């Protein structure tokens, strides 16, 4: 011990041991140790005992805390080393949007909501971002400047989802809520509420404009149904039944022919909405808990996903050949159009809340209640190549990628195309389509964060 501790340190340790044994009601053991160390009772009087009382416990807990900190730092170092090993040179990152990935710190942290943020959505043309919250409001931000533009009030309970889209030249904002309604807002008229769509019998958890349709909107609800609405009339034109529990999320394909939905019944379903009475085209079974989120892969990702599935030639017959789902079972699953799970991505330590495919087709991004944002490389069998460890200070509830700018898009938005949707059906977003390297996330920590190049 003399080789490790100085004489003074050894003496302090001995006294702390005696004080600990005395406090633990082990006087005989304390006396034996005192005798062995030649410490008389006069030397180790009550005042000395008081001084050293609790010292050993404090030292012990300090060691445990330090050990945990070291383990955390080693884990963080491993993540950073992995990111470094897989990093694209900075010069290439700036020039090649197809390879761009978000990195900390965020460009902006947007603060104004008073309760957890549930959803975000980018305007298809302008630098506007909408966020919805459990505080019953929608806030419109300028994501380039990081400034709040306005607060929209109208819902009487939590706002659960928002989306931009609508008829050509007349982009609308849709929102849905726990108050059972969907509301339409006109950005060109100071976000005036132009229509309210009642009809669901329980909370409306997701809403999306259907690309290519111009005036159709799909919603998902806790009443176990999906509904398709005509925004020009406000009428429900189709009701989709099939899920046995709460329908959590919905994602339309790029051409609007298919809709992917997720549910508390542990399944996801792909619907062909071109037929009069849509039924599930395929049911995706495999998750072991509630399926919270989903995304349909863009055609740019087909080659990478086909290789992962062991298919030599990427399919080109459908706009919904591959899909991703995220669940409370902490996993992400990749699926083909036949309902086969081609890969399970494991890495999150809590519920997976949001998914978005990189417009370039190489990556899938996810957010989770573990406070992280993860990037999965589809060219490396879905390997996690980047983790933003503290993307937020609490559960991360949503993620959206800014839509690619289409050169011939009208100034007010074009034909209800959703985030990242290319102009022509089936054509992938490319650098020529001006991929915008901008991502928004929202969290229970009341913050919206903008990650941008």
UniProtKB/Swiss-Prot annotation:
Keywords on record: Cell cycle, Cell division, Coiled coil, Cytoplasm, Cytoskeleton, Microtubule, Mitosis, Repeat, Transport, WD repeat
Biological process annotations from GO: cell division; establishment of mitotic spindle orientation; microtubule organizing center organization; microtubule sliding; nuclear migration; vesicle transport along microtubule
InterPro entries: Dynein_regulator_LIS1, G-protein_beta_WD-40_rep, LIS1_N, LisH, PAC1-like_LisH-like_dom, WD40/YVTN_repeat-like_dom_sf, WD40_repeat_CS, WD40_repeat_dom_sf
Residue ranges of coiled coil: 62-88
Region Disordered, annotated ranges: 84-107
CDD domains per UniProt: WD40 (cd00200)
SUPFAM superfamilies the record matches: Lissencephaly-1 protein (Lis-1, PAF-AH alpha) N-terminal domain (SSF109925), WD40 repeat-like (SSF50978)
Places the protein is found: Cytoplasm, Cytoskeleton; Cytoplasm, Cytoskeleton, Spindle pole
Signal peptide stretch: none
A molecular-function term among this protein's GO annotations: dynein complex binding
Chain positions of WD repeats: 112-153, 155-195, 199-239, 242-281, 286-345, 347-386, 391-449
Family: Belongs to the WD repeat LIS1/nudF family.
Subunit structure: Self-associates. Interacts with ro-11/nde1 and dynein.
UniProt protein name: Nuclear distribution protein nudF-2
């Amino acid at each position: 011990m003399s080789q490790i501790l100085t004489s003074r340190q050894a003496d302090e340790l001995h006294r702390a041991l005696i004080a600990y044994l005395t406090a633990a009601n082990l006087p005989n053991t304390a006396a034996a140790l005192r005798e062995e160390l030649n410490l008389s009772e006069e030397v180790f009087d009550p005042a000395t005992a008081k001084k050293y009382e609790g010292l050993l416990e404090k030292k012990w807990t300090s060691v445990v805390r330090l050990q945990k900190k070291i383990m955390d730092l080693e884990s963080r170092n491993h993540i950073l080393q992995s990111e470094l090993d897989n990093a694209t040179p900075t010069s290439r990152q700036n020039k090649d949007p197809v390879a761009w990935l978000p990195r900390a710190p965020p460009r902006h942290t947007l603060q104004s909501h008073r309760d957890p943020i549930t959803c975000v959505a980018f305007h298809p043309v302008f630098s506007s971002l909408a966020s919805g919250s459990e505080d019953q409001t929608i806030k419109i931000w300028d994501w380039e400047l990081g400034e709040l533009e306005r607060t929209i009030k109208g819902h009487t309970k939590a706002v659960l989802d928002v989306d931009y889209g609508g008829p050509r030249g007349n982009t609308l904002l849709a929102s849905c809520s726990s108050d059972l309604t969907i509301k339409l807002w006109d950005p060109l008229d100071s976000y005036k509420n132009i229509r309210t769509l009642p009809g669901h019998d329980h909370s409306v958890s997701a809403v999306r404009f259907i690309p290519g349709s111009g005036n159709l909107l799909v919603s998902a609800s806790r009443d176990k149904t999906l509904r398709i609405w005509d925004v020009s009339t406000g009428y429900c034109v189709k009701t989709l039944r099939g899920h046995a529990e709460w329908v959590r999320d919905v994602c339309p394909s790029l051409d609007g022919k298919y809709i992917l939905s997720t549910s508390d019944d542990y399944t996801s379903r792909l619907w062909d909405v071109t037929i009069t009475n849509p039924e599930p085209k395929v049911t995706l079974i495999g998750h072991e808990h509630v399926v919270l989120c989903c995304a349909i892969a863009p055609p740019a990702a087909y080659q990478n996903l086909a290789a992962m599935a062991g298919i030599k030639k990427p399919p080109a017959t459908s706009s919904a050949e591959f899909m991703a789902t995220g669940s409370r079972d902490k996993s992400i699953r990749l699926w083909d159009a036949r309902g086969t799970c081609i890969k399970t991505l494991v890495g999150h330590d809590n519920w997976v809340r949001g998914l978005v495919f990189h417009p370039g087709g190489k990556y899938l991004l996810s957010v989770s209640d573990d406070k992280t944002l993860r990037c999965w490389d589809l060219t490396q069998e879905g390997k996690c190549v980047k983790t933003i460890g503290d993307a937020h200070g609490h559960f991360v509830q949503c993620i959206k990628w800014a839509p690619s700018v289409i050169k011939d898009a009208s100034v007010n938005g074009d034909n209800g195309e959703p985030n990242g949707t290319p102009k022509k059906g089936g054509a992938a977003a490319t650098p020529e389509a001006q991929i915008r390297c901008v991502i928004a996330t929202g969290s229970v920590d009341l913050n919206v964060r903008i990650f941008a190049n």
